[in-house]
Swiss-Prot record:
InterPro entries: Nucleotide-diphossugar_trans (IPR029044), UDPGP_fam (IPR002618), UDPGP_trans (IPR016267). Signal peptide: none annotated. UTP binds at L108, N109, G110, G111, K122, Q185, G214, D245, K387. This is Probable UTP--glucose-1-phosphate uridylyltransferase.
């Protein structure tokens, strides 16, 4: 956890809080023990381990809550040159096969495509050229193995939401000469806010009563699934981990050889912040240690400073390089104390509203838990993340080309930040996005684009500079075919083309 400043409390208050923690923890432990004892899951041992890990997380949450901790903002400072390594200073890799033979690749595949209006795993969304995130990721590894005559395993960390569908889709790759495997992250019980009791009363039970605990669970899941032992037995002692929706996260030989030669246990790729990244987690120096800081950990009065690209200039890409024996060590010795991110929401159970809480962790917060860590400043093309329809729209345009599964930016845009694209709710779902913009405009010279309202595009549209397009309320605004828009504002209603 972050270094904390403690609120001073009277002894009577502290005693009361200690009793409250003890009662809540004891009650939760009893309920979890009942779940395990009466469970009908196929792997009772693994389920028991997961409930033990959840209880440890819950108990830490209770302790941190009742002690009244707040973030000590004064101990946090932005990264300086001495806190990171610039990618341009890394030596070139001279023996690719030697290093690749020690590597495995994990893609984080726990998310569904709900934010893009689909009810299947996000990895299966078509990105471009009739290829999904999963297709592109596998193409990368297939090319890497073929080019260097190696066998880098490709592994997916699924959640219970994505596991079944993903395993079905993977059958189509049966003929590929790639070692493809999966493991599943933990399943933790949601907790009622009022009673502080777990929502599920049995296991298994409806999936709505459970939640995936975030990608910080990868460390426990790697060990308890047996994945680490299997990889180490194959001579694979380094892992490259990234989000499956980051289309720039391919294996980089210079980074790989650097972390191996320097025996780095944990390396995080960071990149320059842009105006599109104001809420993305950042790497900071706190009391001489590298730490990940997320938006919800920042005191309200410092949010503006946190989001500024003038103060905190580098963001976490979630591209992480791990030394597997070190992962095994910190898990088995129970050395991991990842920052807890509680999330409260209102859901319906038995047609009645109920407030529930989930406790998640992030892989990035583990950087402070390993012995030899670093941040590597990489160029923006290694962070092409697709979180919403605006991002998907951008990666489908002519700014990018697909090269053996990796997205490569046009040479003319190298060194420049990608365009900032903002779209209103009319474009939120994939189906609506493709209906309204069936033909991708040219955006090689675009700086920013803002679209709002009932807007449609024709064919062969060219966008340059800063563009704002706003349809008047209750009207349709159609951008005609062959239109060239440059540094302009388009408003009103106009329907002079075939939509």
């Amino acid at each position: 956890m972050l270094h904390r400043r403690i609120h001073f409390k009277s002894q009577s208050t502290l005693d009361f809080d200690s009793v409250a923690v003890s009662i809540s923890a004891s009650t939760m432990k009893n309920e979890l023990d009942k779940l395990v004892l009466n469970s009908r899951v196929s792997d009772k041992k693994t389920f028991g381990i997961q409930m033990d890990n959840f209880f440890a997380l819950y108990r830490r949450y209770l302790l941190h809550t009742v002690k009244g901790y707040e973030c000590d903002w004064d101990s946090i400072r932005p990264l300086g040159p001495e806190d990171m390594i610039d990618y341009g200073d890394l030596p070139l890799c001279k023996n690719a096969g030697k290093y690749l033979n020690r590597l495995a690749v994990v893609k984080l595949n726990g998310g569904m495509g709900n934010a893009l209006g689909v009810n299947y795993p996000k990895a299966m969304i078509e990105v471009r050229d009739n290829q999904s995130f999963l297709d592109l990721s596998i193409r990368q590894i297939e090319y890497l193995n073929r080019r260097y005559d190696v066998s880098v395993p490709f592994i997916l960390m699924n959640s219970y939401d994505t596991n079944d569908e993903t395993c079905k889709v993977l059958r189509k790759y049966a003929g590929c000469k790639i070692d493809i495997s999966t493991f599943e992250q933990s399943r933790y019980p949601r907790v009622f806010v009022d009673s502080q009791l777990p929502v599920p009363k049995a296991a298994p039970s409806p999936i709505e009563e459970w939640y995936p605990p975030g990608h910080g669970d990868i460390f426990d899941a790697l060990v308890h699934s047996g994945t680490i032992e299997r990889l180490l037995a194959q001579g694979k002692d380094y892992l490259f981990v990234s989000n499956i929706d980051n289309l720039g996260a391919s294996v980089d030989l210079n980074i790989l050889s650097h972390v191996i030669d320097n025996q780095i246990e944990y390396s995080m790729e960071i990149t320059d912040k842009t105006k599109a990244d104001i809420k993305v987690g950042i790497l900071v120096n706190q009391d001489g240690l590298l730490r990940l800081l997320e938006t919800n950990q920042v005191p309200e009065q410092h949010r503006e400073e946190f989001m500024s690209d003038k103060v905190f200039k580098y963001i976490n890409t979630n591209n992480v390089w791990l030394y597997l024996p070190a992962v095994k060590r910190v898990v088995e010795n129970r050395e991991l104390n990842l920052d807890i991110m509680p999330n409260i929401e209102t859901v319906y159970y038995n047609n009645e509203p109920a407030r529930i809480i989930e406790f998640t962790t992030a892989i990035g917060s583990a950087i402070s838990q390993f012995k030899k860590t670093e941040g590597i400043r990489v160029s923006r093309p290694r962070f092409i993340s697709v979180k919403n329809s605006s991002d998907l729209f951008l990666v489908r345009c002519d700014l990018y080309n697909v090269d053996h599964g990796s997205l490569k930016i046009e040479e003319s845009r190298l060194g420049f930040p990608p365009p900032v694209v903002r779209m209103s709710n009319e474009f939120k779902d994939i189906a609506e996005l493709f209906c309204r913009i069936p033909y991708m405009p040219s955006m090689k010279d675009l700086v920013s684009l803002s679209i709002s309202g009932n807007v449609y595009f024709g064919r062969n549209v060219i966008l340059k500079g800063n563009i704002v397009i706003v349809a008047s309320e209750n009207t349709i605004l159609c951008i005609p075919s062959n239109a060239v828009l440059e540094n302009c504002v388009v408003t009103g209603n106009c329907k002079i083309m075939e939509c």
